[in-house]
């Protein structure tokens, strides 16, 4: 199911969206390729090769999450991002770490279902067309009549005609899981009745709609009939086990220093609960058992207060690849504004174009934006590239507000405009703490 890239191709693709951090890109590219290499091995060697989990160390806003998220999108793998601080030790109120794997399986099921729906899209569309014709001319109409109406249907002549269609009533099957009291987000893996009984007794409802609007619900209905749910679940479990990526952010927040505070004990408990997941265990989900042995875990943290060595030694050993991400320089911030395919500058120009406002941002304005972001990061708190969004919003605040009234006009943003919009705020440290 996953798309296969060489490490060089993976890095090249990541370069299109993320500036710098080549060491981190190389590490994740190799980890991704190693999964494909493992799949080429014969049993029993294939089972013995474990993923080399990664620990990314670096300040906020330098691309840790971006690299992992883009990697998953690139490969088509099921991906789940969680924050370590959201979980509690088993036995305490809160989410337990096994929910990470259940969420991953849910995402895998959605991915596989979408892939299967694409494969049967044409067949589902043909079946939906037949049902629209049934509603228009009746099931007993002659082939010549049906062909005549089919031609009109395809040419759009009947789009506004009202028809009655019968589709599945999805509301009758909505409750598939139960929340466990006192544990928000944790769900018992219980299949709903329709899953157990298959397609028996599915309710339908009659809807009155136009021909144009009838196609989507009918295609959805026909797709569900054509899909083999059992096959989807089996493939989703296999994909989650072999291709799943779990990104655990803020892992430094559960690293403990010496000290016997109860909070430290709880944080250590979360680490101990993570251990079997990262090492390899079997988790029960509502779709079946899933083994975590070959899921790739990428953990990340700033480690401002704590150090990687403050993590439990057992957990450190299960994150063998360490990558340090560098703080962003002025040049990095300048490149982030302009080079990525969906850079901030391109985003704002495209947004203003929807209001028929032409936005031109000069090179000296880009330099000024980067300078201000670097200065604020140094003086207040270093939040990396995220500072650029704050600065850009402030600079374009007036234009964004008045854009609907200025259709057909052009605005030129230069360094003077940037300094005028933000200069006084940036100079006043106390004020900029709250606004920038």
From Swiss-Prot:
One of its GO terms (cellular component) is HslUV protease complex. GO terms for biological process: protein unfolding; proteolysis involved in protein catabolic process. CDD domains: RecA-like_HslU (cd19498). One of its GO terms (molecular function) is ATP binding. ATP binds at residues 19, 61-65, 249, 314, 386. The keyword Nucleotide-binding applies. It is found in: Cytoplasm. This is ATP-dependent protease ATPase subunit HslU. It comes from Bartonella tribocorum (strain CIP 105476 / IBS 506). The lineage of its organism: Bacteria, Pseudomonadati, Pseudomonadota, Alphaproteobacteria, Hyphomicrobiales.
